[in-house]
């Protein structure tokens, strides 16, 4: 979604300058051309009054452009409010003024030109207008891109320890239109999360109403992708959040975690080491360092086909890594004695270390931490008796020390409040597998695993766990409409295109274990869909509009035979039709529904794993179609190591 820009400026004619023309001819087109959605209060303020929706934009807009050409009290009021509550995102513009007041002057200021036209008031100078617009567009873009390089507000310059209010504290309840837009978007994000549709979340994350929401959106998208094991895509989302807010602690932690999941252990340790130096009292960061060390240790000895004895031998050889993990977890527990996650991991690894080495080096420390974990868990359960993590931590402690029946009761108690959360249950399963693989209290570990596995089987029965071997996406030209000036896909070239698509699918061995995405339009989409169904490929058809509108816009103009083919494709048992407005909500203002639909397909395909994606396009290689267009899809798939196959229409006919 476009960045929001709020314009603070005089209205009408003031001091013989037509500011309405300054806005309509200079400011608005320059900012919109740079990709901003522009807001301006639509009437003069009275005694500092401003419409609540516009005041909300003033507070939360990504950029405020203040026209300081004259000393207008309304503009000074708006600029003062912004400077007081936001440190960044302001640029000043002016005409006919040789100086700026010293306390608001920054390098974020720009001069534009007006020309006298008696008896009419001065207006933007036509001779300079294009140059002025280009400079403003570039200036605005640079300001957004340099968001965290320096503070613009003189208030935050003079008070370096003053912190901006959290954006949620700047909510104006009366600004209904603004918050209805946000709440509708947030609801869609939550629905997509509950449906476990990371592709939907990625589209919605791109559509966050303003910059302050983009951090939240990127974090939610990252969390959803992490939960389905798409670590590379998840990392991109957290890096997007950090590009906006580099000091966002949660995103910093998750980046470290994901670097570890991607087995970039050295890079992960370097990242987390820097984090614990910056936040030495943050238990979560210490626990994350422990997690990186632990994962690296497990990865060094675990392997398919290895016996328990072989894994124990190799684990012992890497004892130094487990010591580092124990120290990090124990430090986190000392920093925050209520952080039982750190405590249970330190205790578990101490037991495993003792079992592997045959030496009980720190029994006193271990026992103290055991009791501390029990105390913490009891306190957590007093606050929330249905806290899954507290209950399962108690079970993870019992599996280390208690009889099998006690272990079973503890895991049953945890599963009862898991609320069918696959991620939580699978995380607990991995902890038990660690014990089983190293032959530590195997009967008790297997008893816990049996309970967790039963719960997981109820969430994901076999028929719902199908995953494709290959994921195909298609983008291609529609059949040319009658009278099209520049031919692109003439109707008489249908057989050539169909043969090229079929040959490419055969070359890629498309078959029953695969999944395909397309848009369902006449021409390339339909030919691809038919070829996929002939080969037993499951087909996801994504429509940018409700079905009647889509058929009218993208199918029916080519003739009744294409409509018949659409319904035949739809009736196939391997076809699923998804309507974008039903799944994602209405297309945002200023967004292209076709581009949005293409991104929806692309992100959903990538969420299955970039290595599985095969992008086939029937394309004339002409770019310039923007985000969601064929060129953008080609570049995005290539970025994530997916494979691209271009059927070049300039060579086919």
Question: Model segments located where?
Answer:
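Amphipathic alpha-helical repeat scaffolds of TPR domains
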Residues: 173-195, 199, 210-227, 245-257, ...
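Terminal, low-structured helical/coil segments at or just beyond the last alpha-helical repeat
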Residues: 430-462
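Acidic/glycine-enriched connector segments
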Residues: 23-44, 51-62, 66-67, 96, ...
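C-terminal interaction surface of TIR/SEFIR-family domains
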Residues: 108-192, 575-581, 585-590, 601-605, ...
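TPR/TPR-like (Sel1-like) alpha-helical repeat modules
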Residues: 326, 333, 347-351, 407-421
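Short glycine-/polar-rich loops that comprise or flank the Walker A/P-loop
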Residues: 3, 60-62, 86-90, 105-108, ...
């Amino acid at each position: 979604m476009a960045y929001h820009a709020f314009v603070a400026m005089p209205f009408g004619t003031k001091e013989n300058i037509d500011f309405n023309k300054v806005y309509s001819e200079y400011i608005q087109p320059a900012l919109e051309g740079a990709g901003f959605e522009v807001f301006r209060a639509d009437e003069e303020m009275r005694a500092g009054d401003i419409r609540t929706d516009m005041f909300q934009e003033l507070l939360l807009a990504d950029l405020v452009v203040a026209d300081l050409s004259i000393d207008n009290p309304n503009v000074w009021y708006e600029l003062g409010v912004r400077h007081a509550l936001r440190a960044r995102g302001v640029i000043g513009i002016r005409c006919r003024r040789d100086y700026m007041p010293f306390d608001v002057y920054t390098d974020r200021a720009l001069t534009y030109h007006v020309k006298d036209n008696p008896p009419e008031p001065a207006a933007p100078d036509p001779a300079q207008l294009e140059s002025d617009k280009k400079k403003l567009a570039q200036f605005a873009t640079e300001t957004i891109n340099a968001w965290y390089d320096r503070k613009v507000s003189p208030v935050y310059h003079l008070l370096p320890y003053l912190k901006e209010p959290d954006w949620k504290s700047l909510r104006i309840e009366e600004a209904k239109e603004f918050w209805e837009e946000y709440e509708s978007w947030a609801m869609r994000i939550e629905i997509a999360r509950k449906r476990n549709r990371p592709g939907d979340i990625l589209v919605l994350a791109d559509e966050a109403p303003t910059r302050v929401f983009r951090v939240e959106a990127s974090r939610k998208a990252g969390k959803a992708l992490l939960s389905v094991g798409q670590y590379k895509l998840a990392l991109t989302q957290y890096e997007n959040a950090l590009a906006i807010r580099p000091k966002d602690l949660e995103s910093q932690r998750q980046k470290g975690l994901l670097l570890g999941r991607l087995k970039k252990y050295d890079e992960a340790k370097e990242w987390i080491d820097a984090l614990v130096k910056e936040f030495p009292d943050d238990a979560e960061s210490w626990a994350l360092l422990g997690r990186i060390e632990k994962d690296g240790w497990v990865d060094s000895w675990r392997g398919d086909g290895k016996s328990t004895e072989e894994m124990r031998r190799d684990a012992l050889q890497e004892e130094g890594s487990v010591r580092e993990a124990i120290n990090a977890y124990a430090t986190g527990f000392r920093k925050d004695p209520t952080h039982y996650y750190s405590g249970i991991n330190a205790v578990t690894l101490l037991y495993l270390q003792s079992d592997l080495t045959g030496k009980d080096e720190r029994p006193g420390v271990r026992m103290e931490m055991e009791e501390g974990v029990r105390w913490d868990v009891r306190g957590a359960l007093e606050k929330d008796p249905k806290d899954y993590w507290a209950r399962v931590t108690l079970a993870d402690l019992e599996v280390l020390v208690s009889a099998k029946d006690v272990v079973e009761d503890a895991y049953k108690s945890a599963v009862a409040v898991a609320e069918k959360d696959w991620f939580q249950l699978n995380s607990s399963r991995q902890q038990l597998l660690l014990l089983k693989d190293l032959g530590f209290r195997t009967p008790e570990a297997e008893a816990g695993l049996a309970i967790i596995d039963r719960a997981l089987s109820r969430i994901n029965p076999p028929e719902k766990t199908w995953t494709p071997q290959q994921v195909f996406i298609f983008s291609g030209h529609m059949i040319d409409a009658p009278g099209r000036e520049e031919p692109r896909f003439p109707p008489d070239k249908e057989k050539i295109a169909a043969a090229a698509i079929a040959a490419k699918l055969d070359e890629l061995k498309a078959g029953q274990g695969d999944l395909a995405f397309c848009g369902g339009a006449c021409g390339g989409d339909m030919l691809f869909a038919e070829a996929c169904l002939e080969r037993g490929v499951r087909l996801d058809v994504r429509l940018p509009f409700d079905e009647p509108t889509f058929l009218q816009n993208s199918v029916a103009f080519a003739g009744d035979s294409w409509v018949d083919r659409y319904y035949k494709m739809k009736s196939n048992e391997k076809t699923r039709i998804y309507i974008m407005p039903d799944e994602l909500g209405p297309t945002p203002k200023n967004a292209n529904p076709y581009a949005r639909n293409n991104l929806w397909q692309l992100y959903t395909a990538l969420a299955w794993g970039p290595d599985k994606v095969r992008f086939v396009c029937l394309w004339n290689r002409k770019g310039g179609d923007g985000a969601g267009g064929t060129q953008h899809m080609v570049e995005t798939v290539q970025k994530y190591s997916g494979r691209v196959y271009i059927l070049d229409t300039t060579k086919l006919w």
